[in-house]
Amino acid sequence: MSSNAKWLNKVKWDEHGLVPVIAQEVGTNDVLMFAWMNRDALAKTIETGEAIYWSRSRKKLWHKGEESGHTQKVHEVRLDCDEDVVLLKVEQVGKIACHTGRHSCFFQKFEGGAKDGDWETVEPVLKNPETIYK
């Protein structure tokens, strides 16, 4: 697939050639994670049917689950009204999306008020990350 496809040109890429991506679990609608894609990542995601992101720290394509086996099977791809955010509806293989071993990267919830509040961990570790990433 050409990374110059018309549908790729519709996406409003940022100054670094990236677009923010939200991965949402199909069925439960749980928000699993936030990541980035470049044109190649989005094209390969469509080609393979599995989520492939752009790692800003490693500066390379990142096939979600390439090390852990916790891949994301893509059921649906949506573009928001401003055409600058992508939503992936995915099946999370192994039920673990976060590198901390949790189901979702959004496992901290703000509790309390503006003066006395703090972030509380509200989701358990499903698998020790040391055993996931050897």
Swiss-Prot record:
Q: What is its EC number?
A: 3.5.4.19
| Pathway terms, separated by semicolons | Amino-acid biosynthesis; L-histidine biosynthesis; L-histidine from 5-phospho-alpha-D-ribose 1-diphosphate: step 3/9
Q: Which UniProt keywords apply?
A: Amino-acid biosynthesis, Cytoplasm, Histidine biosynthesis, Hydrolase, Magnesium, Metal-binding, Zinc
Q: Where in the cell is it found?
A: Cytoplasm
Q: Does the keyword Electron transport apply?
A: no
Q: Which SUPFAM superfamilies match?
A: HisI-like (SSF141734)
Q: Where, in this chain's numbering, is Zn(2+) bound?
A: C81, C98, C105
The cofactor note from the UniProt entry for this protein is: Binds 1 Mg(2+) ion per subunit.
- Which amino acids does the record list as binding Mg(2+)? D80, D82, D84
Q: Which Gene3D superfamilies match?
A: Phosphoribosyl-AMP cyclohydrolase (3.10.20.810)
Q: Name one GO molecular function term.
A: zinc ion binding
Q: Which GO terms describe its cellular component?
A: cytoplasm
Could you give the subunit structure recorded for this chain? Homodimer.
**What family does the entry list?**
Belongs to the PRA-CH family.
In terms of NCBIfam families, this protein maps to: PRK00051.1 (NF000768)
Listed name of the protein:
Phosphoribosyl-AMP cyclohydrolase
Task: Record the organism.
Answer: Janthinobacterium sp. (strain Marseille) (Minibacterium massiliensis)
Its taxonomic placement starts with: Bacteria, Pseudomonadati, Pseudomonadota, Betaproteobacteria, Burkholderiales
